[in-house]
Amino acid sequence: MSLLKKKDEKKTEQERVEERREEVLAKGRKFKYPLQWTKHRIVINTILISIIILAIIVVGGWLALYRLGMTDELLYRITKIVPASVATVDNEAVRFSDYLMLYRSSMTSIERQSGSQFDQSSVESLRAEYKRIALTEAEKYTFAASLAKQLDIEVTKEEVAAEFDRHLKIGGIDRSEEGFLKIISDNFGMDKSEYERMLYLSLLKSKVSIAIDENANKIAGQVEKLLSENNNNYGAVAEQLGDAVSYEETGGLVDSKNIDGGRASEAMKLEPGASSGKFVSMNGDGYYFVKLIKKTDSEANFVSIKVPFSEFDKRFNELVESQKINESIKIVDPNNQ
């Protein structure tokens, strides 16, 4: 009897321990679950706040770019990261960053001089004018890129590097890269990657223009043939071809650094009376032929014939007329409202 009583007492003691354990665990759960709920709520609130901030940034950026037409440095940097489009050309997106790059490079020197040379009204008109020019140019580059895909045309990194090196030596001056980058930064507000981007776009458009302009290639062939038959008489050849070409004489010595599409620097390579073969103008708008009349160490007197490219602009204008170019911004000159 006493043995059964001890077993009962022992069992009762174990039960008391279990009960105590459950009480402790139950009290712990009261603290555990509210803490988990609080952490969960903090995570949700953080996500919601992040979404709200992101939405404010997106809406603010959209208003700044598409409604207010802002072009400041921060927005430009954002468009280089975020693939925003400023227009479409035959359903191909025009990069906002390209438009801003072209516009900002054109306006940099003017805005730096505006305090002394231009009144505010003139500056605003210039901004509207250069925005229009930059947007049209960006649209043309996009159209060129679209045609390049169709024609399997590309511009390699090596070609861009070679063109960059050529620009270092424009005018016969062997500039250092550091010095040249300072020049483009001071005058255009561009760094090397931006300048290389501009060179890439220009080279691509030039290659496409050459590939599609059968008429210009045909006329250039006629110029070569006629020059050979007429002892390099540029005036006579230009007269025969009429409006298909343009003829120009310097009328005297001009600086070899003259900004003329590369004609002066090309003439400096020749001997008097010699004629160059055809070469593409530095801005890619046509072929040039040059004949040297006279030169010194730093100047040249020459005549030239230009065969302009026209097919690219013709096709682009057809897109404009058929309303296949849709712009996401409105460019308005405040002085003409």
Locate predicted features.
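N-terminal targeting/tethering segments
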Residues: 73-190, 194
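Extracellularly exposed regions in secreted/surface proteins, prominently low-complexity, repeat-rich
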Residues: 298-299, 305-337
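Peptidyl-prolyl cis-trans isomerase
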Residues: 225-266, 294-301
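Short, low-structural-confidence N-terminal segments
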Residues: 1-125, 262, 266, 284, ...
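Proteostasis/folding factors centered on peptidyl-prolyl cis-trans isomerases
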Residues: 181-210, 262-306
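Solvent-exposed, acidic/flexible segments
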Residues: 80, 92-96, 123-132, 136-141, ...
